[in-house]
Amino acid sequence: MAKIYNENKNVLDAAFERIEFAFNEFDSIFLSVSGGKDSSIMMQLTARKARELGKKFSILYIDLEAQYKATIDHVKVLIDECSDVLEDVYWCCLPLSLRNAVSVIQPKWICWDKKDKAKWVRNMPTGKYKKYVINEDNYPKEWDWFERGMEFEDFILYFADWFNKKHGGLTGTGVGIRSDESLNRFRTIISDKKVRYKGKPWTTQVKFK
């Protein structure tokens, strides 16, 4: 039995309701996918609703290089299973600055750093997935905001702004968060200080200059 969202609705129905709202409200949609359980479920549910409504969406996958093979394999499966409703896939293998939890000498490191290619944990995707890869050598010329070593959090915001300008109109983006997994995630959802889209408590409205 599905988990009860409230006395009249379970979480699955509530999720489909929110996804349909997004498709009806926004001119373009992209999902931020990590290959983890939350964003994977979000992507699969969005694909089901997209087929029902005759819609398409894009995904942003930021590949941080030092990731489990099982995660990479799972992302490939997600892309294959949802390919019929995917507009664009942005598989980013870019030199971003990341926190390093295994060293007190080097608190940060840069993934996919070309000068350290001999030390890469793994190679970039090949075969049929190579066409999705965006790296330091082929990123769009419009990305004049991109800099080697930029912060992960900054990249996401710049990407969202670029994606919106590319498509025009209103853009919606999906992020898989389970509010009962951590206090910070719960506070992110229920915060009354953020600007919400049309008053929906599970949304955050962002405007770029």
What is the role of each PLM region?
Residues 1-209:
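ATP-dependent adenylation/nucleotidyltransferase module used to activate substrates
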